[in-house]
Amino acid sequence: MNTLLVGINVAVMLILVGVLYYMQRKHVSFNKRVFTALGVGIIFGLILQFIYEPTSKVIIESNTWFGLIGNGYVKLLQMIVMPLILVSIISAFTKLQLTKNLGKISGLIIGILILTTGIAAAVGIAASAGFDVSATGLQQGDAESARLKLVEERFTSIEKTTIPDKLLELLPTNPFLDLTGARPTSTISVVIFAAFIGIAFIGVKRKYPEQAELFKKMLDAVYAIVMRMVTLILRLTPYGVLALMAKTVAGSDINAILKLGNFVLASYVALIVMFVIHLLLIALSGLNPIQYLKKVFPVLTFAFTSRSSAGAMPLNIEAQKEKLGISEGIANFAASFGVSIGQNGCAGIYPAMLAMMVAPTVGIDPLQPQFILTLIAVVAISSFGVAGVGGGATFAALIVLSTMNLPIGIVALVISVEPLIDMGRTALNVSGSMTAGLISSKWLGELDQDTYNQDDTKTGEIAS
């Protein structure tokens, strides 16, 4: 019987995919197809919630099949991330886009990311205090116990890692290993490796222009192929969003969410406040924040459904270049740095809130100015090297809690609402990287304001 029900659910999903394909054939705009997929995915997931239990075998098996579309799409995006970073940043050097302002661009983007992460920590602290969020009364069931065991194992691996050690881990010792994404800091390491190649190209160009020109032509060909791959993958976005949203909603445990409702509400209030701060920073830079919101919303929608900052990176770069008018070099740097440095949601708001929740259990007053200032500083510094894939927030929380000498068990006790909160955190992470790129581009005078102010419904070649 279960097999029949699963088959029906999968058949309905395939019909919905067919509807999206029909919309594509009728040249419905890319943004409209993404929003349609989001809405239909939520409705389909709610219907499955109503018919079955979230933990039923039918839902679990159906979600496994839905994952072929949703998770498969995310994996394709992750596949292209490292090649995209490598060729894009080297290409920025060969096109003389970064040679004069490399240090200024990097410093400004990283500075904005770290600053906004510190602000995000303060927002998380305020939300925790305002909603009186506490770890008292949280119960440890089987799922929490299993998660706690994994958390303790992970904590053991990072317990003795100092901040200087973390900074050293950003440097690539084996760039080929980092191209596989094997380390949490692989993204930044690939950026550094690509920058070294770009700097070397500039030196070779001065002494051996013929060899440099040959390298440039080869790189241009590779760049064109990689960007074509990006375009092909991004065209699958509506299908990925549909499957991911249906899977997430169908598998969410409403009762568990209600038990931690205060924490969920406080988290989303903090996330929304921080997003408004992004818009205020954009407005203070002399740009229309509403225009920004309209143009990046499809990217944030995908980040929300996929829960992967790294997976959203190709969309992130494409939107920065084609919709916001940010120069190619700055767009690539902002998106690349934003995956591993200064994640406002996962490395800012989340660890700060957990620290505020658990501090009273060890006799610390979380509202003491010294504790708050120390926590903000620790959160900002610890945001270096947080992976832009699932588990990054846990990694950040463990570092912050251990540095503040606080119990780490709280990380396991909120597992039941982790997917729901992670969706909002990831969207904020991506918004933070795009905000850093936009503000940096504006301040350095490299923003194409005509492109930024232009109303459109397409993202480059994606919609075609």
Curated annotation (Swiss-Prot):
Subcellular location: Membrane
Gene3D superfamilies: Sodium:dicarboxylate symporter
Entry annotated with the keyword NADP: no
Transmembrane annotation, as ranges: 3-23, 34-54, 73-93, 107-127, 184-204, 225-245, 263-283, 347-367, 371-391, 395-415
Membrane topology label: Multi-pass membrane protein
Superkingdom of source: Bacteria
Protein name: L-cystine uptake protein TcyP
Source organism of the structure: Bacillus cereus (strain ATCC 10987 / NRS 248)
